[in-house]
Design a protein with these regions (language model features):
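Alpha-helical interface subdomain recognition
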Residues: 1-86, 233-380
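FAD-binding core of flavoproteins
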Residues: 3, 116-248, 252
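Short amphipathic alpha-helical segments that mediate assembly, nucleic-acid/protein binding
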Residues: 32, 115-116
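Amphipathic coiled-coil/heptad-repeat helices and related helical stalk/stem segments
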Residues: 46, 111-115, 224
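Amphipathic alpha-helical segments in well-structured domains
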Residues: 74-78, 98, 115
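Generic beta-strand or strand-like secondary-structure segments
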Residues: 80, 84, 100-107, 117, ...
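N-terminal glycine-rich flavin-associated loop
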Residues: 92-112
Length: 380
């Protein structure tokens, strides 16, 4: 038995260059005033920003192989992008389209001309897709059974709380057919959608209903189950990088604010009690970075030991998710009264952190997964 390779947690020059490019675009096109304006409008997503990121920077096709029209990058590069998107709470469908839906499609038969063409359109930014599962779906939950397919590929059923479905033109739908599990391509126009009230207004959800919607079978049987599981594992592992970027922004912004704010005749950040809180938070964020980078590295090495992938993803989510929430809560509190206002962007980060906490498996769900390999009894 060979020992697992030591993970490379450092960023490469290519990853640093990618970060700089994404950060420059977000600084120019995704300021907090613009994000607040978006969520107050009828169209919370920013289509112009997405076109710039997806087509001009090629981010929509990061995970798509070059032979299918993508960039042929890995989960490590996608993780860097998600760090920056999380740090800006950018209202774009990268997680839903470029990660979840794309990874599910890559687990299907990419030699099929129609599937290859769809991946090419997604990679070019010409189309957007969403994986039709609840955002709370976690790796290892089993194949969903809320949608049924008949022998002709027509789908009937409902899926609630689907991320990035409102902006998608194509839905990748898990459904149970006459021969068992299957993944189906369905035009978004074939589904009735409603937008429920969601905590995170920068990533609105959709409730979808299918009534004999025409679908094309992408994968069936074990292939469909494996493709869905891989998509959820990849999504959960890379979500940790979004949460990391969010936590880093909260820490940096709070340090900056406390270094400027004066009270009682001195800079607020000079008080020892606040220094200790920020130092503790810094340690949490540094540890979260290690967990998120490890998950991205293991995912980038896929196919590797499935148990190693599951372990790295569960560890990242179990640790990083609470850190992101704590960082956002500390940012709100340490900003004082201004942190409670709508005009200050810190509430966007708290809402995203709380929404991400239940996305793709709660921390408790992932801790239970971690308990299995070390034979810990389940919590009472």
């Amino acid at each position: 038995m060979t020992s697992p390779a030591i993970p490379d947690l450092l960023y490469s020059d290519v990853e640093d260059d990618l970060r700089a490019a994404v950060r420059a675009v977000l600084a120019d096109r995704c300021g907090h005033a613009a994000v607040l304006g978006r969520i107050e409008s009828a169209e919370p997503y920013d289509p112009a920003l997405w076109r710039l990121l997806a087509a001009e920077l090629g981010l929509a096709g990061l995970l798509v192989p070059e032979k299918l029209g993508g960039q042929g990058a890995s989960a490590r590069e996608a993780a860097v992008v998600l760090e920056e998107l999380g740090g800006a709470v950018a209202p774009v469908p990268f997680l839903g389209s470029a990660v979840l839906a794309t990874t599910a499609l890559l687990g299907c038969d990419t030699a099929d001309p129609a599937t290859a063409a769809l991946l090419g359109r997604l990679a070019a930014g010409e189309a957007r897709a969403a994986l039709a599962v609840p955002l709370s779906a976690a790796p290892g939950d089993g194949f969903p059974a809320t949608v049924r397919a008949d022998a002709g590929g027509r789908l009937t059923g409902a899926v609630t709380s689907v991320a990035d479905a409102l902006t998608a033109g194509v839905l990748v739908v898990p459904a149970l057919g006459p021969e068992g599990p299957g993944l189906y391509e369905v035009a978004a126009a074939q589904a009735a959608s409603e937008r429920p009230v969601s905590l995170d207004l920068t990533r609105p959800l959709a409730d979808l209903r299918f009534d004999a919607a025409a679908g094309r079978l992408l994968a069936g049987g074990d292939s469909a189950v494996a493709a869905l599981e891989r998509a959820l594992l990849t999504g959960a592992g890379l979500l940790a990088s979004e949460q990391l970027g969010l936590a880093q922004w909260c820490l940096d912004e709070t340090v900056r604010y406390l270094g400027q704010r004066r009270q009682f005749g001195r800079v607020v950040g000079s008080f020892q009690a606040l220094k200790h809180r920020l130092a503790d938070l810094w340690l949490d964020v540094v540890s979260a970075r290690a967990a998120a980078r490890n998950a991205a590295g293991v995912l980038a090495a896929w196919p590797s030991d499935p148990a190693e992938v599951s372990l790295a993803v569960a560890l990242a989510q179990a640790y990083v998710s609470p850190v992101a929430v704590r960082a956002a809560e500390e940012a709100v509190q340490l900003h004082g009264g201004i942190g409670m206002t709508w005009e200050h962007p810190v509430h966007l980060y708290l809402k995203r952190a709380k929404a991400d906490e239940i996305a793709l498996g709660t921390p408790g769900r992932h801790r239970r997964a971690l308990a299995v390999p070390v034979d810990l009894p389940p919590a009472a």
